[in-house]
Regions:
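A contiguous, surface-oriented mixed alpha/beta subdomain in the mid-to-C-terminal portion of proteins
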Residues: 1-115
Length: 115
């Protein structure tokens, strides 16, 4: 049995859309600031952010979701608006290590704001 390229691409697109849907649901459930955002807008933003994460070399779902969470907390353009985040993203380290650093960086920002 051979699967055509078109069929395979369709499966890949469906899998990516399912991931975007799950990521949007996770963000809406865990980021109170997103409560008032419509599902259509959120899905559009998540699709954009997932594309950005991939452009920085994030492949693993957990790394992409952490990138998306940082974006939800710091803003859609956090990678340009926060020099520290930009520095982390431009590092030559592994994607998982950079996702760890982004998560830590974001926590540090919020802890500084709370304290």
């Amino acid at each position: 049995m051979n699967i055509s390229r078109t069929t395979f691409a369709g499966f890949a697109d469906a899998t990516e859309q399912h991931f975007i849907d799950r990521t949007a649901s996770f963000l809406k459930a865990n980021v109170p600031a997103l409560a008032g955002v419509s599902d259509v807008e959120l899905l559009s933003n998540v699709q954009h952010v997932v594309g950005k994460a991939r452009s920085y070399g994030f492949v693993e779902e957990s790394d992409v979701v952490r990138f998306a969470l940082c974006s939800a907390l710091l803003g859609l353009e956090f990678d340009h608006d926060f020099p520290g985040a930009r520095e982390i993203l431009e590092m030559k380290e592994s994607a998982t290590y950079r996702a760890d650093l982004l998560e830590y960086y974001t926590r540090e920002i919020f802890e500084a704001l709370e304290g």
